[in-house]
Amino acid sequence: MKINFLTLFPRYFEPLINESIIKKAVDKKILEFNVVDFRDFTKSKHRKVDDEIYGGGHGLLLQVEPIDLALDSLENRGGYKILVTPQGKIFDQKMANKLAKYDQITLISGRYEGFDERVTYLVDEEISIGDYVLTGGELPAMVIADSICRLVPGVIKKESVENDSFQNEGLLDYPQYTRPREYKNMKVPEVLFNGNHKEISEWKLKAQLEKTKKNRPDILERIKNEK
């Protein structure tokens, strides 16, 4: 899979690309990244990529032309194109599973007051990572990319993906423990030591349901409505 990032701050993406599991996948040529500074495509002699808002409003908007020209520079115009914006659909695991099937994805990160609305005509989808505001789209773009990359075959073990939170009916993960067996009167549940795989599986599912009910009751409500 190839992922393009269109941004005004290319160095933001270095930790994602150059560390840990994703770097190993890059070295194995399972993943490929291309970071593009769309400021390089402005026709302004001052390298300006934003301007005042028609009709009034605070701040400056990112112009459509530099982004359009940056997309023109990409192979097959960047594959499936995503605008990272607070106005987009909320990103979730189902979306990650869908996006992981593409050969090439482009994530466009904004700044300032956002994008000229005509940028939305250039993309396939608008995505948000939540109902809150950040200083720019780079961090959300990396969140989306990280979530997608780990689903690409060969990046991590298949078993790890299958056991993730949100993969099993969308439920949160069950509690997990390691040594020591007891710490400051906090004990690991005895069922995990009895060797009865059926009982352990039942405990895990019950624990998933309890944790999901406690922390994300909206997920249970959604699952109920889908059935």
Curated annotation (Swiss-Prot):
S-adenosyl-L-methionine binds at residues 110, 129-134. Pfam families: tRNA_m1G_MT. It catalyses: guanosine(37) in tRNA + S-adenosyl-L-methionine = N(1)-methylguanosine(37) in tRNA + S-adenosyl-L-homocysteine + H(+). Its EC number is 2.1.1.228. Keywords: Cytoplasm, Methyltransferase, S-adenosyl-L-methionine, Transferase, tRNA processing. It is found in: Cytoplasm. InterPro entries: Alpha/beta_knot_MTases (IPR029028), tRNA_m1G_MeTrfase_C_sf (IPR023148), tRNA_m1G_MeTrfase_TrmD (IPR002649), tRNA_m1G_MTases_N (IPR029026), tRNA_MeTrfase_TRMD/TRM10 (IPR016009). GO terms for biological process: tRNA N1-guanine methylation. Its main location: cytoplasm. CDD domains: TrmD-like. It comes from the Bacteria. One of its GO terms (cellular component) is cytosol. GO terms for molecular function: tRNA (guanine(37)-N1)-methyltransferase activity. Transmembrane segments: none annotated. Belongs to the RNA methyltransferase TrmD family. Homodimer. HAMAP family: TrmD (MF_00605). PANTHER family: TRNA (GUANINE-N(1)-)-METHYLTRANSFERASE. Specifically methylates guanosine-37 in various tRNAs. This is tRNA (guanine-N(1)-)-methyltransferase. It comes from Mycoplasmopsis synoviae (strain 53) (Mycoplasma synoviae).
